[in-house]
From Swiss-Prot:
Function field: Mitochondrial intermembrane chaperone that participates in the import and insertion of some multi-pass transmembrane proteins into the mitochondrial inner membrane. Also required for the transfer of beta-barrel precursors from the TOM complex to the sorting and assembly machinery (SAM complex) of the outer membrane. Acts as a chaperone-like protein that protects the hydrophobic precursors from aggregation and guide them through the mitochondrial intermembrane space.
Main location: mitochondrion
GO biological process, one term: protein transport
Membrane topology: Peripheral membrane protein
Encoding gene (name): TIM13
Protein name according to UniProt: Mitochondrial import inner membrane translocase subunit TIM13
Native source species: Kluyveromyces lactis (strain ATCC 8585 / CBS 2359 / DSM 70799 / NBRC 1267 / NRRL Y-1140 / WM37) (Yeast)
Highest taxon above the source species: Eukaryota
SUPFAM superfamilies: Tim10-like
Keyword tags: Chaperone, Disulfide bond, Membrane, Metal-binding, Mitochondrion, Mitochondrion inner membrane, Protein transport, Translocation, Transport, Zinc
């Protein structure tokens, strides 16, 4: 993505000035940052789950009984992830209401 599109400009070189207000630009930037953080967090979760659960549960030679260990490990990670995410979102919302961000 070109920086000009982030700041309200077009990627073409038509030379027309950007018509976005500063608040629109700020909103667009916040939205883009939020999306990028969500992707980074999801990627980190997948990497940690893969690293920890598969290392803990899967041994050579593979046995079908190891599936249960992986399932339980994944479920535990997802429960923890959801609890942490809810707490984080609540803190961000509270900070926003208080004008801290």
């Amino acid at each position: 993505m070109a920086l000009t599109s982030i700041f309200g400009g077009s990627s073409s070189s038509s030379g027309t000035p950007a018509t976005s207000s500063p608040s629109d630009v700020k909103t667009q930037l916040k939205s883009q940052i939020s999306q990028e953080l969500a992707i980074a967090n999801a990627t980190e979760l997948v990497n940690k789950v893969t690293e920890n659960c598969f290392e803990k549960c899967l041994n050579a030679p593979y046995a079908a009984s190891q599936d249960n260990c992986v399932d339980q490990c994944l479920a535990k990670y997802m429960r923890s992830w959801n609890a942490i995410s809810k707490a984080y979102i609540n803190r961000i919302q509270q900070a926003s209401v208080n004008g801290e961000i």
